[in-house]
A protein has these predicted regions:
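Extracytoplasmic/lumenal domain signature
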Residues: 1-355
């Protein structure tokens, strides 16, 4: 999570806690040419009030930073962090348990060390989704493994009151939520896209079964992205990019096959949607899907182009540009020798490597 305060950019990073220290959050001052430095880290496991006290070395949830609407004043900011806090040792590693996950609030982010307080503890399953917000509530989901049912949570920021939704089966993995102001949308394993009422999260909602459109849709393991026209975009492990809308109900506008499976949250600038894909740990790349809106308000696909290839990309794509000229794309790879890349793309037949 990035934050810029009075011209200085900071990154808050949750990282795996293998060993005695447990999971940690670090605040990093970002600078060019190798000049970045760590401002603080939370304390190792066992220090109440300044430690996450999360023993698992497996952490996948992206934190959420609430800057209270004052981006140049970090004194009242809160960083919400979800962790898997328990595991059982076995010879040669660790085996994750389905209990012990929790959400914490880190305050005093401008101090030498933050204060850590519990928001919600005793959560069943792994918190493997990012924590997202609609400005009033936090949203996140859990994954208990296999076809076991996970739970999606709605936590009110003002008092930490909780409402939950638990489907009949399957959980939520990397599947962050997005809101249109009335409903919230999130995907799950087994090719399902859910909507829930913000006002009545625990009682009112529905589901769209993507396998009715593509039997090989696969798990939804990306966050749902919504554009200014209200269309919802996400990817599935069956190797598809999807566009859905909520008009008279949740429906599929279109879906398109990608180069391979995908867990990448789409990034849309102008009419271009950038998305990563991968096949194992040594193949994949980035593609650009160009979309248009018809006179009837529907969305359709005029073209798909390769931007980069030769490496597995599971991350989202950070884009500098507006989708009309040359865009610069930044991403990393999930490989034995992973790396960060920058590519440029101007709407042509392919992209160009910058570094």
């Amino acid at each position: 999570v990035l934050q810029t305060v009075n011209g200085t950019t900071y990154a808050y990073v949750l990282y795996d806690g293998y060993g005695a220290s447990g999971a940690l959050v670090a605040k990093v001052r970002c600078a060019e040419n190798g000049g970045s430095s760590i401002v603080w880290t939370t304390d190792p496991y066992g220090t109440e009030g300044t430690s996450l006290n999360a023993k698992s070395g497996f952490q996948l949830s992206t934190p959420y930073l609430d800057d209270k609407g004052t981006p140049d004043d970090a004194s009242d900011d809160t960083l919400y962090v979800g962790t898997i806090s328990q595991y059982d040792d076995y010879e040669g590693g660790e085996w994750l348990t389905g209990t012990g996950s929790k959400v914490m609030a880190l305050t005093g982010l401008d101090q030498n060390k933050p204060t850590v307080t519990n928001v919600l503890t005793g959560i069943n399953g792994q918190i493997n989704t990012p924590i997202t917000t609609d400005g009033t509530y936090l949203y996140f989901g859990t994954w208990p493994g296999g076809s076991n049912a996970g739970t999606y949570y709605q936590v009110k920021l003002s008092d930490y009151s909780v409402k939950t939704f638990t489907p009949d089966s399957y959980g939520f993995y990397w599947a962050g939520a997005v809101s249109d102001g009335t409903n919230v949308y999130f995907g799950s394993d087994n090719g399902l896209l859910y909507w829930r009422s913000i006002a009545d999260f625990d009682t009112t909602g529905g589901v769209l079964d993507l396998t009715d459109v593509a039997s090989d849709a696969g798990n939804v393991r990306s966050t749902v992205m919504m554009d200014e026209d209200g269309f919802l975009y996400f990817t599935t492990q069956g190797g598809y990019l999807w566009c859905c809308s909520y008009k008279d109900g949740l429906t599929v506008e279109w879906h398109i096959k990608l180069g391979a499976t995908s867990t990448s949250t789409p990034t849309k600038v102008g009419d271009r949607i950038y998305v990563g894909y991968y096949s194992g740990f040594n193949a994949g790349g980035v593609q650009c899907v160009t979309v248009s809106i018809g006179e009837d308000g529907s969305s359709y696909i005029p073209s798909v182009a390769p931007v980069a290839s030769g490496f597995p990309v599971q991350s989202s794509i950070v884009v500098m540009g507006d989708g009309t000229g040359t865009d610069y794309l930044y991403f990393n790879t999930n490989a034995q020798k992973g790396a960060g890349y920058c590519y440029s793309y101007d709407g042509g037949t392919t992209g160009s490597k910058v570094w």
